[in-house]
């Protein structure tokens, strides 16, 4: 991140966001690809295995998404909306004007973080290998930590293209492990839409699949987060099973 902020502060690159992305994303990815080309023929590819593991570990999101919601869950269970708003902004950078919106935003945060830190990375790793997984992670970091609006916009455009296919496949998994009819109604209108963001689609599909009721304070609201987490766990098992079958067929 220091390198990102250093490049953004550069007077020569301040108005050249594409060049910043080339340096931050394309250059490391090309170096990784070259390293794998060199290592793959050696010792039957065993020397490349540690590189795969390191890249995958780096590409996967850090931290426990559900554990990060612990203070919010405690405050919401008590019905303390002020404390819930405080810890949500402090811990996960989520805020809202009302309590109902706050819970909805936290639900969306849970779904999005699980998708972008796990499902999308695993998808691109299995499809195109560590080069694609690293590309996705570096773009995500540029979007999350970039200070230059033009740079963030370009990174978002590229990430939107990366997200288009896996987010729809995950929504389909939601339908298989959750309320199929409800998810189908959501996907019917948004399946081929380029305009809807991955975060919006995963939020709509996840809440529909888990049959999330209107926001409520107290234990009922916390139960909605548990329902979404259980949906994500079931989807992860199906995600792995799908890739396992894919690997066997190949």
What are these regions (language model features)?
Residues 1-250:
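Hydrophobic N-terminal alpha-helices or hydrophobic patches in metabolic proteins across all domains
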């Amino acid at each position: 991140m220091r390198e990102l902020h250093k490049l953004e502060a550069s007077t020569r690159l301040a108005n050249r966001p594409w060049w910043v992305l080339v340096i931050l994303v394309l250059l490391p990815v090309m170096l990784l690809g070259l390293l794998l080309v060199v290592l793959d023929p050696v010792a039957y590819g065993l020397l490349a295995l540690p590189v795969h593991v390191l890249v995958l570990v780096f590409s996967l999101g850090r931290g426990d998404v559900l554990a990060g919601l612990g203070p919010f869950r405690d405050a919401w269970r008590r019905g303390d909306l002020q404390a819930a708003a405080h810890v949500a902004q402090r811990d996960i950078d989520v805020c809202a004007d009302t309590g109902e919106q706050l819970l909805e935003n936290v639900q969306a945060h849970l779904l999005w973080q699980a998708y972008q830190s796990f499902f999308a990375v695993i998808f691109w790793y299995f499809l195109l290998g560590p080069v694609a997984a690293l590309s996705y992670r570096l773009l995500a970091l540029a979007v999350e930590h970039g200070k230059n609006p033009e740079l963030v916009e370009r990174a978002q455009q590229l990430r939107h293209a990366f997200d288009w296919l896996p987010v729809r496949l995950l929504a389909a998994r939601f339908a298989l492990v959750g309320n199929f009819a409800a998810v189908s109604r959501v996907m019917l209108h948004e399946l081929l839409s380029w305009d809807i963001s991955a975060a919006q689609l995963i939020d709509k599909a996840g809440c529909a699949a888990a049959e999330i009721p209107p926001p409520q304070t107290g234990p009922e609201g916390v139960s909605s987060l548990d329902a979404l987490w259980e949906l994500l766990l079931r989807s992860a098992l199906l995600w792995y099973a799908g890739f396992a079958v894919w690997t066997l067929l190949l």
